[in-house]
Swiss-Prot record:
One of its GO terms (biological process) is ribosome biogenesis. This is GTPase Der. Residues 3-167, 176-351 form the EngA-type G domain. The gene is der. GTP 1 binds at residues 9-16, 56-60, 119-122. GO terms for molecular function: GTP binding; ribosome binding. It holds the Pfam family MMR_HSR1. Keywords: GTP-binding, Nucleotide-binding, Repeat, Ribosome biogenesis.
Length: 439
């Protein structure tokens, strides 16, 4: 595994700004409101030829009894426990505080190497302020500015100096990317936690307690998976501030970089228009889709309950007729293993390649049974079809006139392909081209 570095400190010292600078993208929510980064966000960076993981933790408020801030403290402790080196960030503008002292005591107990980074030192004249941080009795304080980049290289030099370069193994780059998506409070974080066997992300009954998209790595049946637990998507009418706007965009971005989307529904509630909207993002992005109905343990049911719920899904999510439906419980683990098996199965279909000969044998059979349509005496002619891409499967169909290839006939060809080849869980993209057009 790659080395892991946790960025730890009290709220609003600039941890997320440093994290974003290190990984080169706006992964963590950055705002002036203390406590905005509620959870652990994981990214990857490289320095001096060494690739390592970086964890951005929520700010530690040592004295707060607020339920979210208490959970953030626990999450920071998890990050400390799983890290190899800790970057302890303090605020050079504010100076040393009692909260800094308490965090330092917490870190000292871990016995992990600590790099003390004094942030918001934007010019040389401000550097004398760093000396008060020697009182913490940790490593030499390093002046830096996460916003402007000065001193960041010095911090990273100190970090990599602690790494044992022998035996560092990289995480598989070809892992299957799985986005767990759904409206708030459907149990997305609980599902990820059950799979990982640890309280990896904050779980609370308060909707929206997972604000950012969080990557976790796990192997299932020897196959590496990257699980992306996303902020629950809210209806746009409720997205009234910057934090919610950032998170919605991040969730859509998580869908874009995934291979498979697990669309989580709350089995204790009817399928809603909001569920359909969220599922629509995954469908429009061309991702493999699995519908998982969570909290099934909390549903009063008889032998008809599952079928009745499936009818709701068919009505509200009619565009996902190809997606398998599983009834699960993230709380008890009911059918979670089956869900992971289905992820591997759908991914196999998502990457499936079919020879041109096989495709055209099926095409000939389909057009014989139900001949192509005609309009004003002109008959649609389908010359051949070939697969030109995967993730999702893309089929180029060459015809004499694209205008004659009506949607209804395209749907017929798609259904015939699905009947012959296994494309469970994945959309099929058709590229209609007139003969003579380039691939």
């Amino acid at each position: 595994m790659k080395p892991t570095v946790a960025i730890v400190g009290r709220p609003n010292v600039g941890k997320s700004t440093l994290f974003n600078r290190l990984i080169g993208e706006r992964r963590a929510i950055v705002d002036d409101t203390p406590g905005i980064t509620r959870d652990r966000i994981v990214g990857e960076t490289e320095w001096r030829g060494i690739t390592f993981n970086v964890i951005d933790t929520g700010g530690i408020e040592p004295y707060s009894e607020d339920i979210i801030l208490k959970q953030m403290r626990r999450q920071a402790q998890f990050a400390i426990d799983m890290s190899d080196v800790i970057i302890f960030m303090v605020d050079g503008k504010t100076g040393l505080t009692d909260a800094d002292r308490e965090v330092a005591n917490m870190l000292r107990v871990s016995k992990k190497p600590i790099v003390l980074a004094v942030n918001k030192i934007d010019n040389i004249s401000e550097q004398p302020i760093i000396y008060e941080f020697y009182e913490l009795g940790l490593s030499d304080p390093i002046p830096m500015s996460a916003e402007h980049g000065s001193g960041v290289g010095d911090v990273l030099d100190a970090v990599v100096s602690y790494f044992d370069k022998v035996g560092i193994n990289e995480i598989e780059e070809d892992s299957i990317k799985v986005a767990i998506i759904g409206k708030p409070n459907t149990g997305k974080s609980s599902l990820v936690n059950y799979i990982l066997g640890e309280e990896r992300v904050i779980v609370s009954d308060i909707p929206g307690t997972t604000r950012d998209a969080i990557d976790s790595y796990v192997e299932f049946e020897g196959i590496p998976l990257t699980l992306i637990d996303t902020a629950g998507l809210r209806r746009k009418s409720k997205i009234y501030d910057n934090i919610e706007r950032y998170s919605m965009l991040r969730t859509i971005s998580a869908i874009e970089r995934s291979d498979i989307c697990v669309i989580l529904l709350d089995g204790t509630e009817p399928v809603s228009e909001q569920d359909a909207k969220i599922a629509g993002y995954a469908y429009e992005a061309g991702k493999g889709c699995i519908i998982a109905v969570n909290k099934w343990d909390a549903v009063e049911k008889d032998e008809k309950t599952a079928d009745e719920y499936k009818k709701q899904i068919e009505e509200k999510l009619s565009f996902l007729k190809f997606a398998p439906v599983l009834f699960i419980s993230a709380k008890t683990g009911f059918r979670v293993k089956k869900l992971l098996e289905t992820v591997l199965y759908v991914y196999g279909n998502y990457t499936r390649r079919i020879t041109t000969g096989q495709i055209n044998d099926v095409l000939a059979e389909a057009t014989t049974i139900y001949q192509p349509p005609s309009d004003k005496g002109k008959q649609l002619k389908i010359y051949y079809m070939t697969q030109v891409g995967e993730k999702p499967p893309k089929m180029a169909i060459f015809v004499n006139d694209k205008d004659l290839f009506h949607f209804s006939y395209q749907r017929y060809i798609e259904n015939y392909l699905r009947k012959t080849f296994d494309f469970t869980g994945v959309p099929i993209v058709f590229l209609i081209r007139e003969k003579g057009e380039k691939d």
